[in-house]
Amino acid sequence: ITGSKTFITNGQTANLICLAAKTDKDAGASGVSLIMVETDDLEGFRRGKNLSKLGLKAQDTTELFFEGVRVPKNNLLGIQEGQGFYQLMNQLPWERLLIGITALGAIDFALEETTRYVRERKAFGTRVMDFQNTRFKLAEMKTKAEVTRSFLNDGIQKLDAGILDASTASMAKWWGSQTQCEIMDECVQLHGGYGYMMEYPITRLYADARVQKIYGGTNEIMKELIARSLDV
C-alpha cells in the first residue's frame, strides 16, 4: 500500500485502521477495496501531525502515510476485491442518520444549558428568561428540536426495518445538522458576551456543530440526493 490519507479521526492513536484503497486503478468504482491495517510496528507506516481544528477538540484528527506497506491477504474486508466502494455506500444511510441523531443530542444539551443560564442571569434587574424575545426564541428552538426528534425516530424505525433509503437519510443529515447550527447560534446569542468565552459549554457546542454540515457528505450534496428522489 502506497499513498496518504488526511482528516482521519483518532488517527494518532488507532492501531487498527479500515483503509479504502485502489486495488485496480483501471476499474473505477469496482477497483476500490477495504483493507484492515494493523499499525503496531508496521514498516512503511507513519502518522503525520495532529491537525488543529475549530471544534471537536476531544478527538484527534491527523494525516496518515503509507510507503510500501504490506499487509496479509486475509486483511481484505469482504470475500473478494473490488467491493469497497459498494460496502461504503451501503453504510452511508446509517452514517447520515447517525449525524442527525448526534445533532439532536447536542441540541438537547444546548437548550438545557441555555434555559438554565437565562433563568439565572439578570439584565437591568430582570431575569433574561423574562424578556419576551428570550421566551420566543426558546419556544422556537424547542419546537424545532421536537420536530427533528419525531423525524429521526421515524428514520430509526425504518433503519430497524431495513427500509431506510438514501433520501430519508439525507434529509435527516441535512435537517439535523442545519437545525443544530441554527440553534447553537441562537443559544450563543442568548448568552451574550459569555457565549463567546470558551469556558462556557455553549461556545464549545457552537464550534463543534459547524463540521456537521460538512462530513458524511456536505449538506449541498444531501439536497442534491433529495432532489434526485423527486425527479423520477
Tell where the protein language model's regions lie, with residue ranges:
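A short core secondary-structure module
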Residues: 2-49
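A generic fold-level signal
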Residues: 11, 27-29, 58-59, 164, ...
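Conserved hydrophobic/aromatic beta-strand scaffold that supports enzyme active sites
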Residues: 16-20, 34-36, 61-68, 224
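Flexible, small-/acidic-enriched active-site or ligand-binding loops
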Residues: 42-70
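Cytochrome P450 core scaffold surrounding the K-helix E-X-X-R motif
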Residues: 44, 75-81
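Alpha-helical interface subdomain recognition
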Residues: 63-68, 79-82, 90-232
